[in-house]
Amino acid sequence: MLRWITAGESHGRALVALVDGMVAGVEVTSTEIADQLARRRLGYGRGARMAFERDAVTVLSGLRHGSTLGGPIAIEIGNTEWPKWEAVMAADPLDPAAAAELENSARNAPLTRPRPGHADYAGMLKYGFDDARPVLERASARETAARVAAGTVARAFLRQALGVEVLSHVVSIGASAPYDGPPPQPEDLPAIDASPVRAFDGQAEKSMIAEIEAAKKDGDTLGGVVEVVALGLPVGLGSFTSGENRLDSQLAAAVMGIQAIKGVEIGDGFETARRRGSRAHDEMYPGTDGVVRSTNRAGGLEGGMTNGQPLRVRAAMKPISTVPKALATVDLATGDEAVAIHQRSDVCAVPAAAVVVETMVALVLARVTLEKFGGDSLAETRRNIEAYQRSVADREAPAARARAIRG
């Protein structure tokens, strides 16, 4: 079973991603990982920290000459600002002189005014901290860099095993007019990445940028909606047999686990609830290569399984909780009214969030693909996939024959 985990703090020495269960023979390089990390750092409305964060990638294990070995893959992303934070975030106790010097450091000042909407308050109470630093260091969205590194391996596997491409675009930011056209294709990705807000439409881009500029002027932050599309998936990934095996439940859990994500929908999602059944589902017809559909309202999933249509997943990101126009809070050291702490942050991180949602979708799809087809090497997995696809084609053959007879 494919598993992944990350470790590290926002201002710590490094972030680490560990991927276990990947087959041997998948071609992936540290350059590809760095390229995906660079995509995560894109976006209009990002804060000054993006100029400081430099994602230095080191693959510690699991790859040899650009190919996976079948063992655990460990990836390190170094923090180039570590020398500034070494004393604050040191793993071991400091000597008395260093501790005395740190006592007067602004970086080490206790953070006792939790930010509404962040993990600060509940984390301090749950874990018994008198300072929000230990909470915000791990709760920070900086952790998603490690997920993107892990997801790069999953992307490579999906592309090489199935020919699957996973891409994303921003649907809306704040109150901007949402994009409601057809989903993008792989050839559209360079243009999307070239957009400052990762928009698939020029008018939508202008509306999003205007929203960001207005929020920046007002000292505020913005959220938005992103869409991920996965193309080339076979029929039958996931299962109807139990709730935890349904692919939509796995995708929803993975995407909701991303910092600041507050909602997930598959296909037309909540809009489907407003329709009658005759307008909510995707009717099937015999086609030249089997069953075809005229719509994809289900977003590629029916009964917890892929149905051969493009997978469409949308996620709603809330506005960043570190608001320059500081929100009211309570100082947990004194119990007095206060304004929330303000760390260096972005006005809008929705374009970056789209890349992270891509990552989590790719990881889940890689996991269910390996669960379905198994194998110790990429070549073995491919053979299993090809045998299954032949079987599916045979089952669909009557529909193709019916279409041919009709004409």
Swiss-Prot record:
Organism: Mycobacterium marinum (strain ATCC BAA-535 / M)
Xref: InterPro entries: Chorismate_synth (IPR000453), Chorismate_synth_AroC_sf (IPR035904), Chorismate_synthase_CS (IPR020541)
One Pfam family matching this protein: Chorismate_synt
Catalytic activity field: 5-O-(1-carboxyvinyl)-3-phosphoshikimate = chorismate + phosphate
PANTHER family, sorted: CHORISMATE SYNTHASE
Record: residues binding FMN: 138-140, 259-260, 303, 318-322, 344
Cofactor needs: FMNH2
Chain segments carrying region Disordered: 275-308
GO terms of biological process kind: amino acid biosynthetic process; aromatic amino acid family biosynthetic process; chorismate biosynthetic process
Any one Gene Ontology molecular-function term assigned to this protein's record: FMN binding
Basic and acidic residues: bias regions: 275-284
Binding positions (NADP(+)): 40, 46
GO cellular component terms, semicolon-separated: cytosol
Co-factor note (free text): Reduced FMN (FMNH(2)).
Function summary: This reaction introduces a second double bond into the aromatic ring system.
Family: Belongs to the chorismate synthase family.
Domain of life the protein comes from: Bacteria
EC id: 4.2.3.5
Sorted UniProt keywords: Amino-acid biosynthesis, Aromatic amino acid biosynthesis, FAD, Flavoprotein, FMN, Lyase, NADP
Subunit structure: Homotetramer.
Protein's pathway: Metabolic intermediate biosynthesis; chorismate biosynthesis; chorismate from D-erythrose 4-phosphate and phosphoenolpyruvate: step 7/7
Keyword Amino-acid biosynthesis on entry: yes
Entry-linked PROSITE patterns: CHORISMATE_SYNTHASE_1, CHORISMATE_SYNTHASE_2, CHORISMATE_SYNTHASE_3
Protein name: Chorismate synthase
